[in-house]
Every structure is written in structure tokens, then in C-alpha cells.
Design a protein with these regions (language model features):
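N-terminal secretory signal peptides that target proteins for export/translocation
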Residues: 1-12
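Short acidic linear motifs
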Residues: 33-551
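Bacterial N-terminal signal peptides
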Residues: 19-28
Length: 551
């Protein structure tokens, strides 16, 4: 996955370390949680319901799902059911503490030991039977519809997590999500962040299984509550200060909405249109993360805070270069080890000095052409100061270009791409190529490339958050169809204009989803807004059609 994501990153001409990390986390989360490739030997006559599968429609790649849904009137009162707790039902407190308890098996060492033993047993059985990697519990269960789950095995697995539900109930009701990290003291913020954040995905997987098991046993109200808890965890992580966290939040939110779509197929499931309408919009709020992201370079390399426009002596820059060589060498080693880039060399004072001499003309041109610094002012700086000042200024420039994708409404970006956003991106691309020297890996060729090597690919982060909202709105549209069908004799509407409640909007177009109905089957199509390059298709069947299918 890392290698494939690196290729994606390079194809996008984004060569940053964080770009790769974001693509690895987000793409693996979406694929794992939502999309299944049909097996070559699968029975094509057997339809899967409530599960995303990869497919095509008129040559276009799609994420497709078939749903069988029952008409269901709106709840009375309208907010009888909640997915995200109401403000008056929330408690001031830190949800992160509760998630850590649930993930860390706090005072549950025996259960943790038994779980490890059980997983080893299932893994060994799969090896003995020469099954493919991951083709054993609990991983194989994510492909199974609730009614087909092996109840005894699932119950055995979930019993070892039986301490979690009460903790997760409390977590969903907390107002804040904060890890209170002393990030400014960390020499490697990336390595510091990833382990704890990634563990939330496993917690969401267990919750998803817990939800489907509740559906299988007819515990619908409990399943509704679990779906809300998964979504709340995604929303919580989305408020964290790091984009890595927000992307994991996107993945968790997707797991929750997928479980919700599965739940919508049950005849006893209450209508959740208004519960979804009351959920946060946007589902994943990127404001805090983008604010912190804009100073990530200085967090990763605090020494660069000493670089500014104040004229400094040559002696200062000799000492600064010595100290910076150690910092850069540590960062380069982390980059090389993380992505198996064995050809990347380390840095020492001599190599930095050689690079400064080579990069000085490009650095001076950048400060003159982009920032408008006068020749007289530039003449007062040493070559070393000009190069390091360019790193800071280029990072500022690159961050602002990336930030544009966040402040422009997602549905209007198509028009914007032909004007201001594209011009700025083209300018940044030009300087990026000039600084990186003939397409070499940036960290190995020029210290100037540090200006954008730690800039997140914000257009893809914004798209991921929009895709999360899109999925939630798709589910809400399904609930609108169920609600309206309950009012008009169980019939599907011919147009979303006929819905008795407002049609949710597709974030990719800021319009209702595309909709077709032949009276028996309706199809919802969402715009293509994520990097998988796939549309999302949902087919809906009326109550009468389901009765015929079950006979």
C-alpha cells in the first residue's frame, strides 16, 4: 500500500512525506471499510445487499451498493432518535480519554490475553488450510451480511470486548477530543502521532461488527446507538489538530455511515432522516487541523524558527549550518527508513554548503520574483541566509496555495480551478521543479525543497472530508425515500422533488443527487469527488418488491 500510494503521490507531482502518509491512511481506510472487489469465482447470481462493491457503468468505475429498504414514517417526536448526542445531552469532557481506555484494554489484561490467543488460533487455522492473507476472523466478517454471520464465533470475539460499550457510550457524549500532546518537544511529530491515531480504526472495526451482530439478533435500537457512536468517534477525530487524525476520522465516519446503510434495510429500523439532519455539517471539520498544518515545518524542525529577515553575520550562519545538519540528517533518516528510499544520502555540513552554493541563484530569484525583495536588500544577506530564508518563505507560499482548496466551497472548485487556484498551483509547481533538480527525490537533492516537502495535499484532504459528507447525505436521502414511501402507499417517488422532506445535497455539486426510478428500483448517483475516481450508486427497492423477492 505504501508503494502504490507513493506512485499515486508522484503521479500527482506531489512529493511530500505527509502526502504519502495521508494517501496511505485515507486510501487504505476507504478501501478496507467500504469497497470489495468481486472474487473471480464468486456466484454472480447472488446479490450482496448493504455492501459496497467495485463495478462499472458505461465504462466508468463505480462504488456500487444494492439496498432493500422498507417504507418507514418519520419518528414522533422527530428527534426521538439521535446519532450524535444533542447539546443538552453532552458532558463537558475529553472523549480521547475514553477512547484510549477502550483501545488499551484498561484493567482488562486477561481479556486482552485471551483475545490474542484466539486471533493466533484463527490465524494458524487459516495458514494450515492455505487460505489467503486476512481470510480468517475477524477480518473476513466484514464481507458478511448480518444474517450470515457465524453467531457463536462472533459472540465469543465480542465477549472479549464486552467492557467497551459503556466506555464508548460516555465517549460519544463528551464535548471535546484532545490528546494534550507536548508536540513542541517532539523531534519527529509524524512518528509521534501515527500509532495512537491509527488504533482508532481497529476500535471502529469492532464497533461495526458489534452493530451487525446486533442487527442479526434483532436488537435494532442498540444497533442505531452503535452507529451513532462510530460516527461520533469520526467527528471527534475530525476536530483534532492534525490532518492525519482528521483523515482517520473520515475513515471512521465512513464505517459508521456504511453500518447505517446496512441498518436501513431492516423492517424495524426507525426512520433516521431527522437524526441525520441533526448531525454536524460538515461532518469532518478541518478548521483546527489546517490552522496547525500551516506551521508544521517549524514544528518538525524548530531550529528554523531562528530564520527571519534580520541581517545576521557569517559566523551566525556557520554555527546555524552545523546545528541544522544534525536536524536534517535525522529527518532524512526517518524519511529513508519509512519509505525504503535507500538511495537517499545523509547530510553533513559540507554537503549543505555545497547545496547552498548551487541553490543560491534559484533562491535569490524566488525572493526577488515572488516576494518582491529588492536587489539592495538581497545584497545585504549572505548566500546561506538567502537559501534558508527561501525555505521559510517558500513554505509560507506553498501552505497558502494549499490552503486555497480549503477556503473555496467544494462544489465551486471546478470554476475556481480555471482561475486563481490553478495559476497559483502552476506557479508553485514551477518553483518546486526548479528547486528539486531534474525530478530527483526532493529530500535528497535540495534543502530548498523542504519548503513544500511537509505541505499536505490539501485538495485531497478536502475531497476526503467532502466524500464523508457525501456518504452521510446519501444515507439521509435513502431515509427520505423511506419516509416519503410510507406516506404514499409504499411507492418510490419519480423525482426527488416529490420528497416530503428536503432532499439532501451532494457536496460535489451542491445539488440533490442524480436520481432515476422505474417504479420498482430507484438509483441514486453521487458525483465523483474522491481520489478513487468512482461514483457511488445505490439501488432502492420498495416494500412490495421485497415481498416478491422473499417469496
Amino acid at each position: 500500500m505504501i508503494k502504490s500510494s507513493l506512485k499515486i503521490c508522484l503521479n500527482l507531482r506531489r512529493k511530500s512525506l505527509l502526502s504519502v502518509l495521508f494517501l496511505v491512511i485515507a486510501s487504505s481506510s476507504f478501501v478496507e471499510a467500504t469497497v470489495q472487489e468481486p472474487a473471480a469465482d464468486s456466484d454472480s447470481s447472488k446479490e450482496k445487499y448493504g455492501i459496497w462493491v467495485a463495478g462499472e457503468d458505461e465504462g466508468k468505475r463505480l462504488q456500487q451498493m444494492r439496498l432493500r429498504v422498507y417504507p418507514q414514517a418519520a419518528a414522533i417526536p422527530a428527534f426521538k432518535h439521535r446519532l450524535i448526542p444533542a447539546a443538552n445531552d453532552r458532558v463537558d469532557g475529553n472523549a480521547a480519554i475514553f477512547y484510549l481506555k477502550a483501545m488499551g484494554f484498561f484493567e482488562q489484561s486477561r481479556a486482552q490475553e485471551q483475545l490474542a490467543k484466539l486471533l493466533r488460533k484463527w490465524s494458524d487455522e487459516a495458514t494450515d488450510e492455505q487460505r489467503k492473507l486476512g481470510d480468517y476472523p475477524p477480518y473476513v466478517w466484514k464481507e458478511i451480511e448480518p444474517e450470515s454471520l457465524p453467531k457463536e464465533k462472533v459472540a465469543q470475539y465480542l465477549r472479549l470486548h464486552s467492557f467497551q460499550p459503556e466506555i464508548l457510550y460516555d465517549a460519544a457524549r463528551r464535548t471535546r477530543f484532545e490528546h494534550d500532546r507536548a508536540i513542541e518537544r517532539e523531534s519527529n511529530p509524524i512518528g509521534y502521532l501515527l500509532p495512537s491515531i491509527q488504533q482508532h480504526r481497529q476500535l471502529a472495526r469492532v464497533q461495526s461488527l458489534r452493530c451487525r451482530f446486533a442487527i442479526a439478533e434483532g436488537r435494532i435500537d442498540e444497533a442505531v446507538e452503535i452507529v451513532g457512536q462510530i460516527m461520533a468517534m469520526g467527528v471527534h477525530l475530525g476536530t483534532d489538530e492534525f490532518l492525519v487524525s482528521t483523515l482517520v476520522g473520515v475513515a471512521l465516519h465512513g464505517i459508521g455511515t456504511d453500518a447505517g446503510l446496512m441498518l436501513s434495510q431492516q423492517p424495524e429500523t426507525p426512520n433516521l432522516y431527522w437524526a441525520l439532519a441533526a448531525c454536524p455539517d460538515p461532518a469532518i471539520d478541518l478548521k483546527r487541523a489546517f490552522a496547525w498544518e500551516r506551521q508544521f515545518l517549524l514544528a518538525q524542525m524548530p531550529l528554523l524558527r531562528e530564520v527571519n529577515e534580520e541581517i545576521r553575520s557569517s559566523d551566525f550562519w556557520v554555527d546555524f549550518t552545523k546545528r541544522f545538519a544534525k536536524v536534517l540528517n535525522e529527518f532524512t533518516k526517518e524519511y529513508r527508513d519509512s519509505f525504503n528510499q535507500t538511495s537517499i544520502e545523509g547530510w553533513d555540513e559540507l554537503r549543505i554548503a555545497t547545496t547552498i552554493a548551487r541553490d543560491y541563484p534559484a533562491a535569490r530569484d524566488f525572493l526577488y520574483e515572488v516576494y518582491g525583495m529588492s536587489e539592495e536588500k538581497l545584497d545585504q544577506y549572505t548566500k546561506t541566509q538567502i537559501v534558508f530564508l527561501t525555505i521559510i518563505k517558500y513554505n509560507e507560499f506553498a501552505q497558502d496555495e494549499a490552503y486555497k482548496h480549503f477556503v473555496v466551497p467544494f462544489a465551486t472548485r471546478t470554476q475556481a480551478n480555471s482561475s486563481g487556484i490553478k495559476r497559483g498551483s502552476d506557479l508553485m509547481e514551477m518553483w518546486s521543479e526548479r528547486f528539486s533538480h531534474s525530478g530527483q527525490e526532493p529530500i535528497s537533492s535540495s534543502i530548498l525543497s523542504l519548503g513544500d516537502v511537509l505541505v499536505a495535499p490539501s485538495e485531497h484532504v478536502v475531497a476526503a472530508a467532502a466524500a464523508a459528507q457525501q456518504r452521510q447525505n446519501l444515507w439521509q436521502t435513502v431515509e427520505a425515500l423511506r419516509l416519503t414511501a410510507a406516506e404514499n402507499g409504499g411507492k418510490l417517488v419519480e423525482s426527488l422533488d416529490e420528497l416530503s422532506v428536503p432532499a439532501p445535497l451532494d457536496p460535489g455539486t451542491n445539488k440533490p443527487f442524480e436520481y432515476e426510478s422505474d417504479g420498482k428500483v430507484a438509483t441514486l448517483r453521487a458525483s465523483k469527488i474522491n481520489w478513487h475516481g468512482r461514483e457511488i450508486k445505490v439501488e432502492l427497492m420498495s416494500r412490495d418488491e421485497q415481498k416478491e423477492d422473499n417469496q
